[in-house]
Amino acid sequence: MKIISAVRHSGKTYHSKSLGFVDCDKIIGEAIGWPSHFDKKEFSDKIYSSPLIDEHELAVQFSRDSWKVLEDYTNETDVILSIPEVWSARSFWEWPIKPNVLVTIDEERHKQNLLEINQNHMWPTIKFWRHLLEHEAKENDIKVVNTFEDAILYLNEN
């Protein structure tokens, strides 16, 4: 399994369409849907259902279920998969995975992406995550590149 990770709002969904890798958000949405509070309606109209009420417990269960979906999908299909920063030690997600490569797009492009979706107030948080993930990637021998094109080239060569 070859995996690209990228900080949120870096364009993984957009680039997956033009570069031919698979966006995990789409696979999960089609298979089991998303909890309504995750606001992922652009990926699926399905709502993830669970008897759990507590949002944290629901998120952890969804995390486990969504990883199972991706594991099954990649066992059946030879693809490059893109995931968000769920592999970080500071993430609540329960995905037992490390990416092969981390994409950190140009900071100005990242700010522009946030501006385009009216989320520019998130830049301080996103900037923190960018630095944190770069540090964790280096500690875990995960290749860091600046573009999705470079990530695809790296994965195809290794």
Where are these regions (language model features)?
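Loop/turn-to-beta-strand initiation segments
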Residues: 75-81
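Conserved phosphate-donor/acceptor-positioning beta-strand/loop module used by diverse small-molecule
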Residues: 81-85, 94-114
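Short, charged, surface-exposed secondary-structure boundary motifs
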Residues: 31-37, 108-117, 155-156
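Small-molecule kinase domains that catalyze NTP-dependent phosphoryl transfer to phosphate-bearing small molecules
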Residues: 116-158
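Glycine-rich phosphate-binding P-loop
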Residues: 1-19
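Compositionally biased low-complexity segments enriched in polar/charged residues
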Residues: 2, 18, 88, 96-99, ...
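Conserved substrate/cofactor phosphate-moiety recognition/catalytic segment
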Residues: 17-71
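Short, polar loop motifs at secondary-structure junctions
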Residues: 8-9, 83-89
